């Protein structure tokens, strides 16, 4: 383990993972004396840890009301809503998610949601394979045929005859959508659904 000497009191300060014994000491001390000034709490409890280390261990892992388990899709939507409203104010967001810590929410945002946002941005910037193939086909056809070849071979009457003959045998069935916005999904709607889908899988 990493150990260093604190010059002011010559006490070895322990770093690294917490042991079960240290966890029990901290839990019992807080149960008997309550939370207080974390630096003095660490010394009084007999822990060779910094006050900050004790505070973070208690708040993020040992508190009885810390919620265990994965963040639910409902919590994810709430995190996204609140982040849109308040930005990276993790403590403020955590107050609206009982049992979740600001650190847990921040880590979830950075590893899951922000990652999806970056991927979506990259996908929006990259042309799809179909678009790339269309561009290749257009550039290939333009290179192989000169502009005079296509103009000379075009005949409006032959185009109309072929189209009319083919259209006689086609019948359309079903209702076609009208131009309303009620059935149109925004990119934000689709993105939220994708995140929910990923969270449940």
From Swiss-Prot:
It comes from Petunia hybrida (Petunia). CDD domains: SANT (cd00167). Residues 160-169 have a biased composition (Low complexity). One of its GO terms (biological process) is shikimate metabolic process. Keywords: DNA-binding, Nucleus, Repeat, Transcription, Transcription regulation. Expressed exclusively in flower organs. Accumulates mostly in flower limbs, to a lower extent in pistils and flower tubes, and, at low levels, in stamens. Residues 135-159 have a biased composition (Polar residues). Induction: Circadian-regulation with higher levels during the light period in flowers. Activated by EOBII but repressed by ODO1 via the regulation of its promoter. One of its GO terms (molecular function) is transcription cis-regulatory region binding. This is MYB-like transcription factor EOBI. Residues 38-62, 90-113 bind DNA. InterPro entries: EOBI/EOBII-like_plant (IPR044676), Homeodomain-like_sf (IPR009057), Myb_dom (IPR017930), SANT/Myb (IPR001005). It comes from the Eukaryota. The gene is EOBI. It is found in: Nucleus. GO terms for cellular component: nucleus. Residues 10-62, 63-117 form the HTH myb-type domain. MYB-type transcription factor controlling the production of volatile organic compounds (VOCs), including floral volatile benzenoids and phenylpropanoids (FVBP), in flowers of fragrant cultivars (e.g. cv. Mitchell and cv. V26) by regulating the expression of ODO1, a key regulator of the shikimate pathway, and of several biosynthetic floral scent-related genes (e.g. IGS, EGS, BSMT1, BSMT2, PAL1, PAL2, EPSPS, DAHPS, CS, CM1, ADT1 and PPA-AT). Binds to and activates the promoters of at least ODO1, IGS1 and PAL1. Residues 121-170 are annotated as: Disordered. It holds the Pfam family Myb_DNA-binding. Disruption phenotype: Down-regulation of ODO1 and numerous structural scent-related genes from both the shikimate and phenylpropanoid pathways (e.g. IGS, EGS, BSMT1, BSMT2, PAL1, PAL2, EPSPS, DAHPS, CS, CM1, ADT1 and PPA-AT) leading to reduced scent production (reduced emission of volatile phenylpropanoids, e.g. benzyl alcohol, benzylbenzoate, methylbenzoate, methylsalicylate, eugenol and isoeugenol).
């Amino acid at each position: 383990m990493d150990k260093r000497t604190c010059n002011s009191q010559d006490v070895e300060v322990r770093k690294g993972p917490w042991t079960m014994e240290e966890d029990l000491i901290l839990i019992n001390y807080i149960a008997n004396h309550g939370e207080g000034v974390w630096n003095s709490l660490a010394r009084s409890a007999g822990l060779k840890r910094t006050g900050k280390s004790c505070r973070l261990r208690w708040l993020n892992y040992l508190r009885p009301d810390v919620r265990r388990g994965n963040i639910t899709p409902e919590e994810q939507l709430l995190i996204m809503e609140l982040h849109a409203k308040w930005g990276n104010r993790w403590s403020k967001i955590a107050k609206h998610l009982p049992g979740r810590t600001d650190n847990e929410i921040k880590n979830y945002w950075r590893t899951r949601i922000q990652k999806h946002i970056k991927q979506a941005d990259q996908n929006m910037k990259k042309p799809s394979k179909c678009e790339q193939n269309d561009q290749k086909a257009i550039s290939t056809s333009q290179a192989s045929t000169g502009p005079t070849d296509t103009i000379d071979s075009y005949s409006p009457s032959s185009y109309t005859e072929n189209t009319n003959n083919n259209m006689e045998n086609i019948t359309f069935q079903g209702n076609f959508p009208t131009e309303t916005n009620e059935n149109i999904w925004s990119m934000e709607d689709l993105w939220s659904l994708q995140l929910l889908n990923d969270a449940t899988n």
